[in-house]
């Protein structure tokens, strides 16, 4: 998913660097820019959903939740290095909440 946004950003950069943009290409460029911005917001919502799911489910089903969260992150790490930071954050939340559930 992250690789799709990188490809879209690269295509937008190539498209925006044309020497003589006419009205049609300006409209297309504006439309493409809006699509990229919207897709980036959707990607951030996806990340926030994973973090919230981790926090809400960790105490009840730690092993199931870890597998549910780890699989998307391991696949994203292959495509995007910045996902590693998100994976470490979610893993830290998982470990912290697991220890808290054991103490209770």
Swiss-Prot record:
Residue intervals passing through the bilayer: 30-50, 54-74, 84-104
Domain of life: Eukaryota
Keywords per UniProt: Endoplasmic reticulum, Meiosis, Membrane, Transmembrane, Transmembrane helix
GO biological process annotation, one example: meiotic cell cycle
One GO CC term, this protein: endoplasmic reticulum membrane
Membrane topology of this protein: Multi-pass membrane protein
Cell compartments where the protein resides: Endoplasmic reticulum membrane
Record's keyword annotation contains Endoplasmic reticulum: yes
Protein's job: Has a role in meiosis.
Name of this chain's protein: Meiotically up-regulated gene 150 protein
Organism of provenance: Schizosaccharomyces pombe (strain 972 / ATCC 24843) (Fission yeast)
Organism taxonomic ancestry: Eukaryota, Fungi, Dikarya, Ascomycota, Taphrinomycotina
